[in-house]
Amino acid sequence: MIKVGIVGGTGYTGVELLRILATHPEVELTAITSRKEDGLPVSDMFPSLRGRVDLAFSSPDKAKLTECDVVFFATPHGVAMAQAPELLAAGVKVIDLAADFRLQDTAAFEKWYKMPHSCPELLKEAAYGLVELNRDAIRKARIVGNPGCYPTTMQLGLAPLLKADVIDASHLIADCKSGVSGAGRKAEVSMLFAEAGDNFKAYGVSGHRHSPETVERLQILTGQKVGLLFAPHLVPMIRGMHSTMYARLTKEMDNAALQALFENAYASEPFVDVMPFGSHPETRSTRASNMLRIALHRPNDGDTIVILVVQDNLVKGASGQAVQCMNLMFGLPETTGLLHVPVLP
């Protein structure tokens, strides 16, 4: 059994990790930390886990994280990089759901996250945790930077076209919408029901930290310079993400060839569903699952291709993806513990 610790288990990604790992057949949950909730049974905070998780929260100094096989960080940015060196020295693998190990460019990290990087030497060995595009590196990694939720949809939606060199990489547009759980569990006025309900707004249009992450990874993947206009939006639902990407075709391709490009790219991917051309995927079709669904459109048979991508921002966009990485790191089938059917209605 894989001994698992979770640092920061009181947020939405933390409880989502607990939900998934509680039924994972190869995992033994051994520690979950929270300074504020030290001693509180996990099931008291999250009654949904009664009978599944019998751990109590413990402060980090009591948690014996160095005795784990892997530690997940479901924490604010900056926490994992402070603790990772000690864990790695003890032979513990690290998966960070924040941004500490996503960007290779430390200057970009410091610009967008407003803090110095405390262990830049670890970035060279950190694997970016988007399994479908970086599987081999993740298998061999000691430390993984789990992708952001928006970058997951943007990269999987654009990668086949960029790798085939059939679109203008210098002018990509991503219009993305997320449920409010993407903002985390902290108390914040803009996330109150009376503020977020019955409302729809854009944010971060002049610059968002997920943009440099997406651009860096697409450039590493393709060797092309990438230009991206990214506009995120907050929608009045709890979980779910819908991303619409626009790109200009630079090569003559019919719709069947475009569809085949995506079907071939993801034919062996258990968590990527390429829907029939012209489909309209819905966020609810992925709720509480690790599935991501893609559909292509070509308005008026012109030179613009529209890529629609949906996922659950807390699962494939965060905790499910992290468990998918863990499975690879420990030589398990990557679907282990992740074959949940989406919840409807």
Curated annotation (Swiss-Prot):
Keywords of this entry: Amino-acid biosynthesis, Arginine biosynthesis, Cytoplasm, NADP, Oxidoreductase
Protein's name according to its UniProt entry: N-acetyl-gamma-glutamyl-phosphate reductase
Species name: Herminiimonas arsenicoxydans
SMART domains: Semialdhyde_dh
PANTHER family: N-ACETYL-GAMMA-GLUTAMYL-PHOSPHATE REDUCTASE, CHLOROPLASTIC-RELATED, N-ACETYL-GAMMA-GLUTAMYL-PHOSPHATE REDUCTASE, CHLOROPLASTIC-RELATED-RELATED
Record's function text: Catalyzes the NADPH-dependent reduction of N-acetyl-5-glutamyl phosphate to yield N-acetyl-L-glutamate 5-semialdehyde.
InterPro entries: AGPR_AS, AGPR_type-1, NAD(P)-bd_dom_sf, NAGSA_dehydrogenase, Semialdehyde_DH_NAD-bd
SUPFAM superfamilies membership: Glyceraldehyde-3-phosphate dehydrogenase-like, C-terminal domain, NAD(P)-binding Rossmann-fold domains
Biological-process GO terms, alphabetical: L-arginine biosynthetic process
Similarity section: Belongs to the NAGSA dehydrogenase family. Type 1 subfamily.
Top-level taxon of origin: Bacteria
List of catalytic residues: C149
GO MF term (any one): NAD binding
This protein's pathway: Amino-acid biosynthesis; L-arginine biosynthesis; N(2)-acetyl-L-ornithine from L-glutamate: step 3/4
